[in-house]
From Swiss-Prot:
Protein name: Anhydro-N-acetylmuramic acid kinase
Binding-site residues, ATP: 12-19
EC number(s) per entry: 2.7.1.170
Family statement: Belongs to the anhydro-N-acetylmuramic acid kinase family.
Keyword ATP-binding annotated: yes
Gene Ontology terms for molecular function: ATP binding; kinase activity; phosphotransferase activity, alcohol group as acceptor
């Protein structure tokens, strides 16, 4: 198949902003430049459009209002305003990205638009990512693929995680053999496990940065625990940690996908700022480690992306608990910040070709499923 240029967009549950990334792929192989040591050069240019505080507030309020959704088309409370904002902000992000990189809409074959998840209840057959793909396509003059989780959920899958097929393709392109773990730590954490035969298992492991960020925002006014410095000064409350790890969703057999709102920072409310940060950070790390009970082979190497890869305390905990080599994605030429945006560019190309986005071992769907809603400009 012909290599095409795709832009991927990701606005995660951490609500920090919009990641933009361009890749070249045919929906199967990925164009890379590989160095002698097996590491790779960046896949393509990237960009970012941060959210202002008032914009974050709107999205938080819309997410709370989303608890009232009973059907996918429902938009109670502030959701209509938030959906318009999400579409507009993503358009701004791409327009700025194109200008910064000397590109025009004609240079891009497709945009993969994830939107903003406001509710994810796969057992109820419900997943909603706000953002209007058709309106985005009209404004940009570029074909857009959006709503990539819905088909999987409609066919009995968890609708998440979606990135494993990209993880596997990137690992193969870079020459990394299994047993390998690829961990993305955003608001939630999800793992892709590739065994020595190339078989793939993927699932959400539990909380990511979400509870830590919420804790820091509430206690300090800061958006995150920079470099894990606050957690590093604290002591883990072992009793609370064991209580948190007893959450039924942590213990559930894959396939499983989780909702950010199922893990609250408020359970640590009686602790000091430092001890709360340490305990919530340990919760994320231990949930990943306990997920290895579901693996056919224990990975000997982990590649970590997402905001959590920049949390030194979390990375240290992971290295100790996983008893394996733990690498920041940036250190091997991958992108810890833009891995998910790159994945949605890749998924958009697969959707155009009718290739599967999800598999029984990634979402629990009964057979491989493609997906996505294609909107022409």
């Amino acid at each position: 198949m012909t290599m095409k240029r795709a832009i991927g967009l990701m606005s995660g549950t951490s609500l920090d902003g919009i990641d933009v990334a361009l890749i070249e792929s045919d929906g199967e192989s990925i164009r890379i430049v590989k160095s002698a040591n097996g590491f790779i050069a960046p896949l393509g240019p990237t960009g970012y459009r941060g959210y202002r505080e008032d914009e974050k507030t709107l999205l938080r309020e819309a997410t709370r209002d989303a608890e009232g959704i009973r059907a996918r088309a429902d938009r109670p409370g502030r959701l209509p305003q938030a959906e318009d904002f999400v579409t507009h902000a993503h358009a701004e992000a791409i327009e700025a990205f194109l200008a910064e990189n000397g590109l025009s809409p004609a240079d891009i074959d497709v945009v993969g638009f994830h939107g903003q998840t406001v509710i994810h209840r796969p057992k109820l057959g419900l997943t909603v990512q706000i953002g209007d793909g058709a309106a985005l396509a009209r404004r940009l003059g570029i074909r857009v693929v959006s709503d990539m989780r819905a088909d999987d959920v409609a066919q009995g899958g968890q609708g998440a995680p979606l990135v494993p097929v990209f993880h596997k393709a990137l690992a193969e392109a870079a020459g990394f053999a299994g047993p390998l773990g690829i961990l993305n730590i955003g608001g939630l954490a999800n793992a892709t496990l590739i065994d020595s035969s190339g078989n793939m298992l993927a699932f959400d492991t539990g909380p990511g940065n979400g509870p830590i960020n919420d804790w820091m925002k509430e206690r300090t006014g800061r958006d995150l625990d920079e470099d894990g410095a606050t957690a590093a000064r604290g002591t883990v409350d072992k009793d609370l940690l064991e209580n948190l790890l007893g959450h039924p969703l942590i213990l559930r057999q894959p396939p499983k996908s989780l909702d950010r709102n199922w893990f609250s920072h408020r359970l640590a409310g009686y602790l000091t700022i430092e001890d709360g940060a340490a305990t919530l950070t340990a919760f994320t790390a231990h949930a990943v480690a306990r997920s290895l009970a579901f693996a056919s082979e224990r990975p000997t190497r982990w590649i970590v992306g997402g905001g959590g890869a920049k949390n030194r305390t979390l990375m240290t905990m992971l290295e100790r608990l996983l008893k394996a080599e733990v690498l920041n994605a940036d250190a091997i030429g991958w992108s810890s910040d833009f891995l998910e945006a790159q994945a949605f560019a890749y998924l958009a190309l697969r959707a155009l070709e009718g290739l599967p986005l999800t598999y029984p071992t990634t979402t629990g769907v009964s057979e491989p499923v493609t997906g996505g809603l294609v909107s022409e400009p």
